[in-house]
Amino acid sequence: MEWAVDTALHAVDAAPLELSGLAAVAAPDHGHIAFVPHPSVGLVAANYPVDAIWRAVLSQDEAAMTAIDLAAGPVWLMVERNASGVEAFRLPEPEWRFMSELCASRSLQEAIDAAPEIDAASVLAGHLAAGRFIRFGLRSELIQVVN
């Protein structure tokens, strides 16, 4: 968690993806689209409520620390820097799997396959609107750019 927070805090600024470019992608290629996440976006999966621990420690809230239930089960978090600062929030586990695939620049189809139970179009639209991606391309093109 701390690594993701530090990464978000010190990530370079980057303009969010210009969504109009997505409209130019031919329908047969939609499943091959891959995204590049904003440099401040990170994903954390933990067996304990590390987000609650982080907040309690940051606010030096002994009552909140005492109230944390370590047996509450796993958490799936997204960490990002936005206009308000660094934020960490929970995602449903299937959405986290979907975003984990997308943030690894895997294809949209691979992300859908990793979380078939979600409404991928709605989830993707929400994350695009929030500016969590900065670039896209067909997966084969992105692999060449990154390597």
Regions found by a protein language model. Name each.
Residues 1-86, 90:
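Hydrophobic packing positions characteristic
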